[in-house]
Structures are given as structure tokens and as C-alpha cells.
Regions:
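Catalytic core of pol beta-like nucleotidyltransferases
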Residues: 1-32, 40-46, 57-113
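Short beta-strand->loop micro-motif that forms the acidic, two-metal-ion catalytic signature
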Residues: 51-55
Length: 113
């Protein structure tokens, strides 16, 4: 199983800052955060983005909240120089629709944050 130690120093700092910012702004919402894609696999190019899945209970998050999440991701991207591609999904989607290729990738290569 891959862990945060598989990421580079800058990637770990990016993920830590993203998590810290989300935790700070969303104290009342529980969520899971997973890094997946080329950066999680360790085969990223210098220009590769960082794919991040956020699983939340959609009953507790509004469209405005999703916009705030994307703004945080943009801020962290600008500060780090690595583009964060954020995917916000309902917490049950992996179990229900796990056969979608993106969710297969999350299960196979994901790094929980």
C-alpha cells in the first residue's frame, strides 16, 4: 500500500497544506481525501497535475461549499506550482460505482491523506 512517504517533499507539503486549509474552513464537515493518479503512482512528469478525490456526504455540502473547495485547491496550486485537480464525490460512490475507471484508479493507487 502506498503512503504519503511515496510522495516527494513538495508533494507532501502541498497535500498537507490542502488538508490543513480544508480542515480549517470546513470544521463541521467530515470528509476523506485521497491522492491518486501519476503523482500517487510515482510516474509523474514535472508538469503533471495532482489528482485529489474528496469524499463527503453530499447532504452536508452545498454548491457554494464545492466552490470554496475548488478555491482552496486553486490557492494551493498557485503557491506550490503544481495544479491540483479536485474531484468531489459522495462518500458512497466508490462502493456503488466502483467499476468506473477513475474509482478503480483511486482504489488501486490511492494514498489516503
Amino acid at each position: 500500500m502506498r503512503t504519503l512517504q511515496n510522495l516527494s517533499d513538495i508533494e507532501r507539503r502541498l497535500v498537507a497544506e490542502l488538508r490543513r486549509r480544508i480542515d480549517t474552513e470546513f470544521t463541521d464537515i467530515e470528509f476523506r481525501m485521497t491522492v491518486f493518479g501519476s503523482r500517487a503512482r510515482g510516474d509523474a512528469d514535472p508538469d503533471s497535475d495532482m489528482d485529489v478525490l474528496i469524499e463527503v456526504d453530499v447532504e452536508h455540502i452545498s454548491f457554494a461549499d464545492k466552490r470554496r473547495l475548488r478555491r482552496i485547491a486553486t490557492d494551493v496550486s498557485m503557491a506550490s506550482g503544481i495544479i491540483v485537480s479536485l474531484l468531489v464525490v459522495d462518500q458512497g460512490i466508490l462502493a456503488e460505482r466502483g467499476d468506473f475507471s477513475v474509482f478503480e484508479n483511486v482504489r488501486e493507487e490511492g494514498i489516503a491523506v
